[in-house]
Amino acid sequence: GESYVLAVKPSDANLDNINGLIGLLVESDKPIAVNSGSANGTNADYSSGESGQDAGMDQLVPVERIGSEYIFVRGVGPSQVERPLIVAHEPNTEVYVNGNLEFTIAQAGEHYSIPSSFYGVTYNYNNGVGPAINESSSMHVTTSNPVFAFQSLGGARPDFGSGNTTGVPNQGMFFVPPINCQTPRIVNNIPAINQIGPDPDLFFEGVITIVTETGSTVLITENGAE
């Protein structure tokens, strides 16, 4: 039950600490649980002086469970936040985005931060309008070797009462599982989806994005009726 913590603190005097733990290899002689992330970090450019941080942390899986195909769906954060992170486990790992080779990660443990422009959509972070209905905002990523994948995305808009003007403070980060035979076919259920948040009078203006294989039939049931 004991734990061991590795942590770094970025500063203007030591900017190397910003990426200091990305790609760190952890090995043990017995099974362990590994959590990775930041309690007060940002996917924005720290050296630019952009203010605002938030929590982003998730539990990792062993290397045997990572894969080479991933789907990312954009949130409603600013472009500098909405960037997936790919961490290579093997050298010379090619990264393909939407079918095109975009980058080769030279060494194991190195990473590639994918620009948000590959989502194909951008949201104005100075208003509270969510994504448009039936608008594609996904990114398909494949790699030549298995990789660890993380996604950073933005949430509430500034005029929802956060008090900021850039949207940067409202962000999170999580580990993304690969597409494989374990990908679920049924999501059951999402209760009170139109009332996300503590205020019952505040209705969520976001959308649900469903990404499927070509030719798939998607059935949505609400209150027992399709």
Regions found by a protein language model. Name each.
Residues 1-226:
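Conserved functional hotspot residues at active sites or interaction interfaces
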